[in-house]
Amino acid sequence: MKQRLKVKYLNTVIPELKEKFVYNNLNQIPSIKKITINRGLGQSHQNSKSFDYFLDELSVITGQRGIVTYSKKAIASFKLRKKSPVGVSVTLRGEKMYAFLDRLINLALPRVRDFRGLDKKSFDGCGNFSLGLNEQLMFPEIDYDKINSVCGMDISIVINSGNNEESLFLLRELGVPFSELKVS
């Protein structure tokens, strides 16, 4: 079963992209390649129970088991040893990627307090988009009573477009809410 966001991309977004931008080849049409969700452990890297909890929580949110990221060198001021766990990362592709993006757009972002849209300045110049979330409570899969600590995550959407304009158009047509800055 195809995800509804992928069906929308194939049926409506691709023709609109072809109409607005000129492409000589079908492979030049921008598409989302992967979504990477990264979550740092902060002070929790010393406690293995909270570390396992963060790993399970991220797998519930994304539908895929994460991998552990380790420190490359020791930093004494952070009480960090070499090769100690410092974060959890998940890379989503294919159907799970579209399912997560659909849940992010339609369920999680509207639940953010005082949400007025995502900032257009979060593009990196090559068409990739990054956003940071302050808490995990916005996802409906998370049970409020079972949370050890509130912490956020970084989400990077990798798009194979050469510039920010095409990526912004693609994400806007998929339904990602961007803020409209009014110049006064």
Swiss-Prot record:
HAMAP family: Ribosomal_uL5_B. Its main location: plastid. Belongs to the universal ribosomal protein uL5 family. Keywords: Chloroplast, Plastid, Ribonucleoprotein, Ribosomal protein, RNA-binding, rRNA-binding. One of its GO terms (biological process) is translation. It is found in: Plastid, Chloroplast. This is Large ribosomal subunit protein uL5c. Part of the 50S ribosomal subunit; contacts the 5S rRNA. GO terms for cellular component: chloroplast; ribonucleoprotein complex; ribosome. The gene is rpl5. Binds 5S rRNA, forms part of the central protuberance of the 50S subunit. SUPFAM superfamilies: RL5-like. Pfam families: Ribosomal_L5, Ribosomal_L5_C. Transmembrane segments: none annotated. GO terms for molecular function: rRNA binding; structural constituent of ribosome.
